[in-house]
Protein backbone atom coordinates (compact mmCIF):
# COMPACT_ATOMS: atom_id res chain seq x y z
CA UNK A 1 0.00 0.00 0.00
CA UNK A 2 1.35 3.40 -1.00
CA UNK A 3 0.34 5.33 2.12
CA UNK A 4 2.12 8.47 0.90
CA UNK A 5 -0.45 8.83 -1.88
CA UNK A 6 -3.22 8.88 0.71
CA UNK A 7 -1.32 11.41 2.84
CA UNK A 8 -0.73 13.56 -0.24
CA UNK A 9 -4.42 13.43 -1.21
CA UNK A 10 -5.44 14.57 2.27
CA UNK A 11 -2.91 17.43 2.39
CA UNK A 12 -4.92 19.23 -0.30
CA UNK A 13 -7.92 19.42 2.05
CA UNK A 14 -6.56 19.39 5.60
CA UNK A 15 -3.92 21.32 7.52
CA UNK A 16 -2.82 18.27 9.49
CA UNK A 17 -2.59 14.62 8.48
CA UNK A 18 -1.49 12.36 11.32
CA UNK A 19 0.16 9.01 10.65
CA UNK A 20 -0.70 7.15 13.88
CA UNK A 21 2.38 6.12 15.83
CA UNK A 22 4.71 8.05 13.51
CA UNK A 23 3.98 11.78 13.32
CA UNK A 24 1.94 14.45 11.61
CA UNK A 25 2.37 16.28 8.33
CA UNK A 26 1.26 19.90 8.65
CA UNK A 27 0.66 22.56 6.03
CA UNK A 28 1.03 26.31 6.31
CA UNK A 29 -0.09 28.76 3.65
CA UNK A 30 2.61 31.06 2.26
CA UNK A 31 1.60 34.21 0.39
CA UNK A 32 2.48 34.88 -3.23
CA UNK A 33 5.71 36.79 -3.77
CA UNK A 34 7.83 38.35 -6.50
CA UNK A 35 11.61 38.19 -6.65
CA UNK A 36 13.10 41.59 -7.33
CA UNK A 37 16.14 40.60 -9.34
CA UNK A 38 14.52 38.17 -11.76
CA UNK A 39 11.03 39.62 -11.61
CA UNK A 40 9.66 36.12 -11.14
CA UNK A 41 6.20 35.60 -9.66
CA UNK A 42 5.58 32.74 -7.25
CA UNK A 43 1.93 31.90 -6.49
CA UNK A 44 0.70 31.28 -2.95
CA UNK A 45 1.28 27.74 -1.74
CA UNK A 46 1.08 25.39 1.20
CA UNK A 47 4.42 24.47 2.74
CA UNK A 48 4.59 21.02 4.35
CA UNK A 49 6.31 20.38 7.68
CA UNK A 50 6.51 17.34 9.96
CA UNK A 51 6.03 16.94 13.71
CA UNK A 52 7.15 13.58 15.13
CA UNK A 53 5.50 14.36 18.49
CA UNK A 54 1.92 14.23 17.16
CA UNK A 55 1.19 10.51 16.97
CA UNK A 56 -2.38 9.94 18.16
CA UNK A 57 -4.81 8.41 15.71
CA UNK A 58 -7.44 11.01 14.81
CA UNK A 59 -9.03 8.60 12.31
CA UNK A 60 -8.58 10.84 9.26
CA UNK A 61 -5.92 8.80 7.46
CA UNK A 62 -7.37 5.42 8.43
CA UNK A 63 -10.86 6.41 7.27
CA UNK A 64 -9.46 7.69 3.98
CA UNK A 65 -7.42 4.51 3.42
CA UNK A 66 -10.42 2.32 4.29
CA UNK A 67 -12.66 4.13 1.80
CA UNK A 68 -10.13 4.35 -1.03
CA UNK A 69 -8.78 0.80 -0.65
CA UNK A 70 -12.24 -0.69 0.05
CA UNK A 71 -11.30 -2.29 3.36
CA UNK A 72 -12.47 -2.07 6.95
CA UNK A 73 -11.28 0.73 9.22
CA UNK A 74 -9.64 -1.86 11.48
CA UNK A 75 -7.68 -3.37 8.58
CA UNK A 76 -6.62 0.10 7.44
CA UNK A 77 -5.24 0.80 10.94
CA UNK A 78 -3.26 -2.46 10.79
CA UNK A 79 -1.89 -1.68 7.30
CA UNK A 80 -0.87 1.83 8.39
CA UNK A 81 0.83 0.30 11.44
CA UNK A 82 2.80 -2.04 9.18
CA UNK A 83 4.04 0.92 7.13
CA UNK A 84 4.92 2.85 10.30
CA UNK A 85 6.97 -0.12 11.53
CA UNK A 86 8.82 -0.23 8.20
CA UNK A 87 9.54 3.52 8.21
CA UNK A 88 10.65 3.46 11.86
CA UNK A 89 12.99 0.54 11.16
CA UNK A 90 14.52 2.39 8.22
CA UNK A 91 15.10 5.53 10.29
CA UNK A 92 16.53 3.60 13.25
CA UNK A 93 19.07 2.14 10.83
CA UNK A 94 19.97 5.60 9.49
CA UNK A 95 18.17 5.15 6.18
CA UNK A 96 15.94 7.76 4.57
CA UNK A 97 12.20 7.55 4.14
CA UNK A 98 11.23 9.12 0.81
CA UNK A 99 7.56 10.07 0.51
CA UNK A 100 6.67 10.91 -3.08
CA UNK A 101 5.30 14.46 -3.47
CA UNK A 102 5.59 15.06 0.29
CA UNK A 103 9.24 15.03 1.27
CA UNK A 104 12.05 13.04 2.80
CA UNK A 105 12.74 12.10 6.41
CA UNK A 106 16.28 11.32 7.49
CA UNK A 107 18.20 11.03 10.76
CA UNK A 108 20.84 13.54 11.89
CA UNK A 109 23.93 12.85 14.03
CA UNK A 110 21.87 13.19 17.23
CA UNK A 111 19.42 10.54 15.91
CA UNK A 112 16.69 13.17 15.51
CA UNK A 113 14.36 12.92 12.53
CA UNK A 114 14.80 15.68 9.97
CA UNK A 115 12.11 16.44 7.38
CA UNK A 116 12.91 18.05 4.03
CA UNK A 117 9.72 18.94 2.12
CA UNK A 118 9.35 18.21 -1.57
CA UNK A 119 8.75 21.34 -3.60
CA UNK A 120 7.13 19.54 -6.50
CA UNK A 121 3.49 19.90 -5.43
CA UNK A 122 1.44 22.92 -4.38
CA UNK A 123 -1.22 21.69 -1.95
CA UNK A 124 -3.06 25.03 -2.00
CA UNK A 125 -5.98 24.41 -4.35
CA UNK A 126 -6.83 28.15 -4.37
CA UNK A 127 -3.63 28.71 -6.37
CA UNK A 128 -5.15 27.08 -9.42
CA UNK A 129 -7.52 28.87 -11.78
Q: Over which residues does each language-model region extend?
A:
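Cytosolic/nucleoplasmic/matrix-facing N-terminal domains/tails
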Residues: 1-129
